[in-house]
């Protein structure tokens, strides 16, 4: 989230933002601003930068881990990009009740991929948790997972996880709006666990790991592993899911926080990226944009490939329904792949629910 404005404007704006965040955090630290304690255990997964850290795949992994233990998790998200306001029930743990335009693309993806999880969107995480307590009083979830909540200090958490993208030079970064930092790096001291994501395993990984270890917080490392390629001939038809076949010539498109990581993942699977189109994170697609992508793919005999998040975003846009009926497109499923610290993560997650 950096802005294309002169440095003479951005630098003072970043300094002002930094001071506002510093004052706000100090008010919480001194308990002038009060933190609410939920009767249900809370796990927060957030970041210290604006988008593209690999947070959503980690949220998905944690939800699936709790489900594998026989737990009933609830996911609380802001629902970025949604056209609704207030507290909304996305899934009751049995049925997904909303499309992505009403709850946000990432939230819709999490709900559909974890049908047994309760999913709520709300601007204020506390409002969402109190809604869960009232709405599911007779069958409470075992744990609530706050998506993107590191900066939301109004609600206390039992475990605070911060995800950091190795590819972002955070230790030389500026605050929003000049840079991508949401708050100063010193505030990583609030976290219980740091996850260094999208690692390459080279000298960059080692250097950033050393920097993070200076915080005194445990650090685990994870790359992004490609799953299957889901291809649809007409995006409302039954999906065909299969392993990625090397040699596919693709037109890749995405509207995510870190699109180059998507390209790197595709190329790592042997997919040849002949052309690509990037859009802003959470940007709505239009019929004109989709038609242009299809025309280019047809002319160059390329396969349209996008992210799972973009797929769900398109499905939720009413104005795209007609063109999507005939659009052939594939999306790549991804997951975190831990290279160091998976056992520690599970131990800390278990402790939250007294396992």
Curated annotation (Swiss-Prot):
Gene Ontology molecular function, alphabetical: ATP binding; tetraacyldisaccharide 4'-kinase activity
Enzyme Commission identifier(s): 2.7.1.130
Any one Gene Ontology cellular component term annotated for this protein: plasma membrane
Class in the EC hierarchy, top level: transferase
UniProt keyword list: ATP-binding, Kinase, Lipid A biosynthesis, Lipid biosynthesis, Lipid metabolism, Nucleotide-binding, Transferase
Record's catalysed reaction(s): a lipid A disaccharide + ATP = a lipid IVA + ADP + H(+)
Signal peptide as annotated in the record: none
Coiled-coil segments on the chain, per record: none
Pathway linked to the protein: Glycolipid biosynthesis; lipid IV(A) biosynthesis; lipid IV(A) from (3R)-3-hydroxytetradecanoyl-[acyl-carrier-protein] and UDP-N-acetyl-alpha-D-glucosamine: step 6/6
Pfam families per UniProt: LpxK
Transferase is among the record's keywords: yes
Recorded family membership: Belongs to the LpxK family.
PANTHER family: TETRAACYLDISACCHARIDE 4'-KINASE, TETRAACYLDISACCHARIDE 4'-KINASE, MITOCHONDRIAL-RELATED
Name of this protein: Tetraacyldisaccharide 4'-kinase
Species of provenance: Chlorobium phaeobacteroides (strain DSM 266 / SMG 266 / 2430)
Lineage, highest ranks first: Bacteria, Pseudomonadati, Chlorobiota, Chlorobiia, Chlorobiales
Gene, per the UniProt record: lpxK
